[in-house]
Amino acid sequence: MRYAKERHNLMVILQRHGIRNEKVLNAIASVPRELFIDEAFSHQAYENNALPIGSGQTISQPYIVGKMTELLELTAQSHVLEVGTGSGYQTAVLAQLVDHVYSVERIKALQWQAKRRLKQLNLHNISTKHGDGWKGWHNKGPFDAIIVTAAAEEMPMELLAQLTDGGRLVIPVGDDLQVLKKITRNGEQFVSQDIEAVRFVPLVAGDLA
């Protein structure tokens, strides 16, 4: 397997950083990250770093992908929404873990590229949409888990409304200083847990690109 040594080394790094869920680790190990980045960065594919993917966006560092995926507490039957398809890498990881993934991307060029990559990997349990991530995907909800791959300045209420009872929202919140949060729905109440400081590109609402 190409990059086999690099993939193994990355798994060791993720475990050292506290990623413990074997299913999540196996999902990350099974996705060829080099397919989701520009060829110029392919030599960095299995380094624990974020990398540019164009349009002012990035592919998250593998640790953050692992951490956010763990926090979703997924089962195979989990109904999952991803806000911010980006390169499609996080989408591909989720697709290893659940029966179906719904993913929204506001930048058409990124959505198209992600669809092409996911098809190349024969991942057919994914539905993508060009749309405003702040609004979620109302007619496909409610969702057991929602993951947001860009930072919101404030909590998107429409996403909270699309959670099932007991559903989890994992989202970075803040402007310059951002905190990764896990929000769990309990009836009409929402329990918020601060996880750690992070740095993401901003979650842009409104007009599509």
UniProtKB/Swiss-Prot annotation:
It catalyses: [protein]-L-isoaspartate + S-adenosyl-L-methionine = [protein]-L-isoaspartate alpha-methyl ester + S-adenosyl-L-homocysteine. Gene3D superfamilies: Vaccinia Virus protein VP39. Keywords: Cytoplasm, Methyltransferase, S-adenosyl-L-methionine, Transferase. Its EC number is 2.1.1.77. It is found in: Cytoplasm. The keyword S-adenosyl-L-methionine applies. Belongs to the methyltransferase superfamily. L-isoaspartyl/D-aspartyl protein methyltransferase family. This is Protein-L-isoaspartate O-methyltransferase. It comes from Photobacterium profundum (strain SS9).
